[in-house]
């Protein structure tokens, strides 16, 4: 499946870019952009990396402080929960 090019957070559009980075991913609040380096992640890891950067985007937009260790724990935990419970995720997203 192809990497999405964008997402919305609190009604604001964000872009997803592929970039050469020092780390696997980066969240750039002033550009409303998540940057991912696919060279540094497997196909499964890129999903958790994207979710990790989205948690950083939420952190910035809600003006909260979460340690990098906890951002990682939250993103990995949410991804595992979504993967294990697709019916619940589908139910949550129904209008």
Residue ranges and their predicted role:
Residues 1-45, 61-95:
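Metalloprotease/metallohydrolase-associated module, dominated by Zn2+-dependent proteases
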Residues 48-60:
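Active-site recognition of the HExxH zinc-binding catalytic motif
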